Amino acid sequence: MNMIDNAKAQVRQLTVAAYEKAAAAGLLPAGTTVEPAVEIPKDTANGDYTTTFCLAAAKAMKMNPRQVAQTLADAMTLEGSYFTSVEIAGPGFMNFRLGGKWFADTVAAIESAGEKYGENDSLAGKKYMVEFVSANPTGPMHMGNARGGVLGDTLASVLQKSGAHVWREFYVNDAGNQIEKFAKSLEARYFQIIKGEDAVEFPEDGYHGDDIRELAQAFYEKEGDKYLDCDEKTRHDALAQFGLSVNIPKMKSDLARYGIRYDQWFFESSLHESGYVAESVQALTDKGYTYEKDGALWLKTSEILASQLRREGKSDEAIEKLGLKDDVLRRANGFYTYFAADIAYHRNKFAVRGFDKVINIWGADHHGHVARLKGAMDALGLDGEHRLDIVLMQLVKLVRDGEIVRMSKRTGKAISLTDLLDEIPVDACRWFFNAKPETQMEFDLGLAVREDSENPVYYVQYAYARICTLLKTLAAEGYTVPAAAEAELSVLTADEEKTLIKQLAQYPAVVYLAARDYDPSFINRYLVELAAAFHKFYNACRIKGEAENVLLSRLKLADTARAVLKNGMTLIGCSAPEKM
């Protein structure tokens, strides 16, 4: 139940009822069809809710807006409503002030919803896939993967809370150029182990990390030199499969440690082995979107994108300046490109598995691939423009003692996800990486482990633990949290109490916005604001030592804040410790 929406709906009902009453009495012209717009004022000194109905309706009535507002206020009956007063302000605003019934009903609604508080049905019946991380299985996961993991996992949770059926997927790039480069890197280290470091030159564009040395050593210890003199393909296949058999379980383990589990790990190789890549390329050919040149098969990407841009109103001259290019789907050697496999993979998501919406979390460096992939889906008749959404996330910079920690996966000096989790608590990692995806972020390693109010995750968890300690202390004295119906909630009249309840009422709207905008960082910001509202309430409104009716009502409010804090922390994958 969204108590803010309920209050807004009641303002509209009261306003319309007052207008109809005044019109029936001949005090206002009949026939006005203006829908009352209701907002929460930025300055609550002006009331809790306001409507601009009179400003809009007065034009049609050819009357002074303040006169219309006063007539409505005189005709309005607030008895039994959530509001105690309505005031006229400015040129004709009608400002409504909440009464005790709304505050009591809000606490009761949160109690009734329990763990389901904040849920909405805006995406009910929709089948969503969120594909995220999908790191190359050729080495340790880096900070971009760490950020993408949190964003994808938390977004999936937020979408679920908005009613969607959500599928989490990791796309394993176990085919193509990256795997060949992986095999050649392992091969060079394998040869060096057998023949000596200086006897074999390492590929300049290979993977230089220590993990490659370790994999090659493990392969040698298992197989010896049996692959030294065999044909290259056999050796490459054996090395690559061995490396993947070590790396992929390690990735799964690290992500599970990070609180991330997938519904499916989908392997690129399966698309090739099943013939689905070839089938998907043929589907594009059948629709007239491919052509052959220099022995290769090309997608008419420029034609597809130009058509889309014309639909958006772009002129041919503007389109020509973009320098759109076509893409190779099948090389002259007969091998399919990564783009061809990606098209097949996304066709599988829509045409085979029937997802209504697919969301990919990508690094911002992939921005050039977005329109191409959406266009390919459009060409296949799968409405990529509306069904495929790409969330682009900016780079991550690690900062320690005010200095940026440089990352370079190929020089072997990268800080991996494993390294990060060894140093920083999972809760802090998940909190800080759950920032707005379009902003470049600096992850302050020092701040993440601080135990003070400067660290937002600590600040929020401390508020939760503080409430748990309070409940435990009062329980020892014989006071238990009452049900909302048994508490005398009408005594909660202090500004800090009302502010806290209003903040608690915001949660469902925050969840809705996080899902709508694909931005789960809404939850983080809300939790900090909720923790601040609780601390102000706790510092201003004494609980122990008060009259029993006040003590129990404030105890109920504190416990309600505890429940919503836990709800939000759970949603973003952070723990809610009962003591710090």
Segments predicted by a language model, with ranges:
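Non-catalytic interaction-recognition regions
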Residues: 2-104, 111, 115-580
